[in-house]
Amino acid sequence: MYAGGRVVRSAFARGKVCYLIGSVLWGSVSCTQPRVQKWVQNDGKVNVHSPQERAGVVATFGTVRITRSDYERTKAELQDVVAHLNRITAERDYHKWLVYLSDAYRRAYSMPDILQQSSDALPKKGVRLRHLRDYFIHVFVPSRQNVRVDSIVFESPTRVDVIMNHGGKALLVYKIEKIHSAWKLLP
């Protein structure tokens, strides 16, 4: 998934501001109580709104606001995408999987150094990943069994992190972006 740890400020989720901490394969989400935010309108005046005043808005990116209905619609779309990915994973269908990859994902997981790092991290020693197909078979398929969408976090109006709760932890299972009206996996 996302290489290297980073903290990303994201949307309001159930009245709390969440921070996503990415790691090599999984991430976690921690939340703190919301603070009053400053929003700049087009006329240049700064208005201060509490989260209660913006109850219908879950994220803002410049002048673009993601509403609760946008959130629910996007979550439903991503539940369908993840259901398709679950079937593809169960069937080990490499060619159908390729349809869901962004160009950046294909490039990243075709790079020799990334494939070598992934080979070194595999529990089964002696497996050498040489191609994207090897990554799919030995890394993606075993790590993406029965994924579900418990929540989503908007990184931008088109980029979303898919979160699954497991064992009391929130796990980042997919970074995904809407590209030309289709959801594509990001590295």
Curated annotation (Swiss-Prot):
A lipid is attached at residue 18 (N-palmitoyl cysteine). The keyword Lipoprotein applies. Its main location: membrane. Transmembrane segments: none annotated. It is found in: Cell membrane. Keywords: Cell membrane, Lipoprotein, Membrane, Palmitate, Signal. One of its GO terms (cellular component) is plasma membrane. The lineage of its organism: Bacteria, Pseudomonadati, Spirochaetota, Spirochaetia, Spirochaetales. It comes from Treponema pallidum (strain Nichols). Residues 1-17 form the signal peptide. It is a lipid-anchor. The keyword Lipoprotein applies. A lipid is attached at residue 18 (S-diacylglycerol cysteine). This is Uncharacterized lipoprotein TP_0503.
